[in-house]
Each structure stands twice: as C-alpha cells, then as structure tokens.
C-alpha cells in the first residue's frame, strides 16, 4: 500500500469506531466523536469480494 514504513504506520495504525466509523488513535479506549467503547483495529489488507 504505502511506499514508506512511516507512511503506512500513519495510515494503518488506527482504531475504527464500530458505531460511527470515526478514525481514532491506536491507544484510544473510546471513540473521540461519539464516546463508544467498541473499537476495532483498522484492516491492514484490503478485503476481496
């Protein structure tokens, strides 16, 4: 995906809120927008159909 290691870290090391799909920092415990506690790590690979 990204050309450089630091670029891919910036793009992929995120948490995604399961309720509102907001991007949050990796260390987040709850969503910054809606306060929901169920966060998932952002997918590192694209999904195939």
UniProtKB/Swiss-Prot annotation:
<dbReference type="InterPro" id="IPR001975">
    <property type="entry name" value="Ribosomal_eL40_dom"/>
</dbReference>
<keyword id="KW-0687">Ribonucleoprotein</keyword>
<dbReference type="GO" id="GO:0006412">
    <property type="term" value="P:translation"/>
</dbReference>
<keyword id="KW-0689">Ribosomal protein</keyword>
<dbReference type="InterPro" id="IPR023657">
    <property type="entry name" value="Ribosomal_eL40_arc"/>
</dbReference>
<dbReference type="InterPro" id="IPR011332">
    <property type="entry name" value="Ribosomal_zn-bd"/>
</dbReference>
<dbReference type="GO" id="GO:1990904">
    <property type="term" value="C:ribonucleoprotein complex"/>
</dbReference>
<dbReference type="Pfam" id="PF01020">
    <property type="entry name" value="Ribosomal_L40e"/>
</dbReference>
<dbReference type="GO" id="GO:0003735">
    <property type="term" value="F:structural constituent of ribosome"/>
</dbReference>
<dbReference type="GO" id="GO:0005840">
    <property type="term" value="C:ribosome"/>
</dbReference>
<dbReference type="InterPro" id="IPR038587">
    <property type="entry name" value="Ribosomal_eL40_sf"/>
</dbReference>
<protein>
    <recommendedName>
        <fullName>Large ribosomal subunit protein eL40</fullName>
    </recommendedName>
</protein>
<comment type="similarity">
    <text>Belongs to the eukaryotic ribosomal protein eL40 family.</text>
</comment>
């Amino acid at each position: 995906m990204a050309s450089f290691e630091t670029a891919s870290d910036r793009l992929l090391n995120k948490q995604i809120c399961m309720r509102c799909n907001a991007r949050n920092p990796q260390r987040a415990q709850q969503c910054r927008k809606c306060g929901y506690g169920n966060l998932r790590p952002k997918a590192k690979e694209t999904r195939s159909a």
